[in-house]
Amino acid sequence: MKNSRNIVALICILLVVISGMIAVSAADIAFSTESLEQEEIETILSNINITKLSNEPSKKVIQCFSVNTDGTIAVGCGSYNKKTVCIYNSEGIFQYGYSFQTAGSFGIELKEDILYIYFVRSDIALAIDPDGQINSVTRIQNTIENNSYWNHSVFSTKISTEQYEYVIKNNLGIFNVFASSYSLLTKTDVYGNETVIYDVNNTQQFRVYSTLFFIVVFLSIGVYTLFFRLRKSRL
């Protein structure tokens, strides 16, 4: 009888410990997620091909960003299917980063020393530590709450902490409306003093102006062709 009680007590303790572990795991990510089969996880990781970076890659326009409670900053960049996330300290000095492959958009969150990468097209949430080890790969559920979190948290252009307000933005004047990414990351203290942490404004200007140039050329060719055909039909 005594052994039976000990076994029951041990089972209860294990259940409490496991429940606590599950609660902590769920608290690490704000999205509600579901587990994946190991074979599917391996396929995802093979396709993404995530690699740790020890040297800072060339800076590109900002797709997304996140700020940790200690002021550590994660900046997500990329073009086409090659993406990077670079980790900077509070002064904007590069620490380490990751490169990976994905054709769609992505968002990031930095919680303590764990980086969460959220893939929009596949609804995958990936957690990776500073050593480049994958902690988890789960699927983000399609819920109203998750959709709201995508829009208002993951892809927010402003993050506020106790000491600073971090903002990603452009400095292109009236041409800001043509930019789908961001060229500046700034932090502003409680006294209104602004510090630029990340700046690729010249790159963004070239991208936007080049796009506008090709749009104008395309429209001009279209208008000229239409005018030529109308004139020809009247002859």
Language model regions located:
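Acidic, glycine/polar-enriched metal-coordinating patches/loops
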Residues: M1
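Eukaryotic scaffold repeat domains enriched in small/polar residues
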Residues: S4-I13, I18-L235
